[in-house]
Amino acid sequence: MTELKNDRYLRALLRQPVDVTPVWMMRQAGRYLPEYKATRAQAGDFMSLCKNAELACEVTLQPLRRYPLDAAILFSDILTVPDAMGLGLYFEAGEGPRFTSPVTCKADVDKLPIPDPEDELGYVMNAVRTIRRELKGEVPLIGFSGSPWTLATYMVEGGSSKAFTVIKKMMYADPQALHALLDKLAKSVTLYLNAQIKAGAQAVMIFDTWGGVLTGRDYQQFSLYYMHKIVNGLLRENDGRRVPVTLFTKGGGQWLEAMAETGCDALGLDWTTDIADARRRVGNKVALQGNMDPSMLYAPPARIEEEVASILAGFGHGEGHVFNLGHGIHQDVPPEHAGVFVEAVHRLSEQYHR
């Protein structure tokens, strides 16, 4: 495999010395970029874009041509796994993702297959291999999956949800069915992420977007327990290097200590958690990724720089910080504001690594 020219991101995740704080943006390949919109129009629809390795590679690389980012992230979607289980994923205009056959009971769970990542999800592995080839060792490639709980919310609700009443009804009225689904998803995600690593992903991230809607006790039982199982089953060495694992529960700042016990290398933080406080609590165990409010990118450049400086100061001197937004970049952010953000992180962080 090609030697990495910039391994800052991987080093920071392992709390090793770096020259400046590495930075990337969740959803950095996305609708705020006019070139992304053009490629998506060429593909026809979102899933066609995901399933075409050359086009998925193109949109993965687009933000790297604009900004000096320290990592690329595979262009895909967390719902590829439930789609491969046969739930019939489609996208409703203005509604987001929907499934034609939601999971309603234990009998539905029992019928679900565990997808073969090189078969039903082979298009994702083709994209990983294509992106790795085209990156030519410039920066590392991040692979990812949704967490079992987050995937289950879409599968049981039949799509996006605001109140999560359908899955919570299953959780409280038929916990056995939900545990069976989460267990099957944990196995599927472990296979899926390991296949991404074998195909060339140099780090992986588990997105638990909806873990924050749970009580503390339910989070431990229905979300964290299954992410822990995945972390235990992942390939942690490949191609002569450690493969770092980041867990990110949006709205999960109160559970960082428990998350840090899973054996992951890093935790993602959303913008509601104070990074200085997070470092005091778990910084001796894991690296931290985050955590600027994505809406800050609407602010004037001077205000963006001020916020970057504040977060860098909050984390302080030393290793173990990957700068990011606290969630995905919004689709109507001016692309030049993202550029201000990335440049500010590199320039203003140098003093913390001397």
Curated annotation (Swiss-Prot):
Involved pathway(s): Porphyrin-containing compound metabolism; protoporphyrin-IX biosynthesis; coproporphyrinogen-III from 5-aminolevulinate: step 4/4
Family: Belongs to the uroporphyrinogen decarboxylase family.
Source organism per UniProt: Escherichia coli O81 (strain ED1a)
One Gene Ontology term from the biological process aspect of the record: protoporphyrinogen IX biosynthetic process from glutamate
Localization of this protein: Cytoplasm
Alphabetical keyword list: Cytoplasm, Decarboxylase, Lyase, Porphyrin biosynthesis
Catalytic activity entry: uroporphyrinogen III + 4 H(+) = coproporphyrinogen III + 4 CO2
Annotated Gene Ontology cellular component terms: cytosol
Site residues (Transition state stabilizer), renumbered to this chain: 77
GO MF: uroporphyrinogen decarboxylase activity
UniProt protein name: Uroporphyrinogen decarboxylase
InterPro entries (alphabetical): UROD/MetE-like_sf, Uroporphyrinogen_deCO2ase_HemE, Uroporphyrinogen_deCOase
Binding site for substrate: 27-31, 77, 154, 209, 327
Function: Catalyzes the decarboxylation of four acetate groups of uroporphyrinogen-III to yield coproporphyrinogen-III.
Alphabetical list of CDD domains matching this protein: URO-D (cd00717)
Description of how the protein assembles with itself and partners: Homodimer.
Enzyme Commission number(s) of this protein: 4.1.1.37
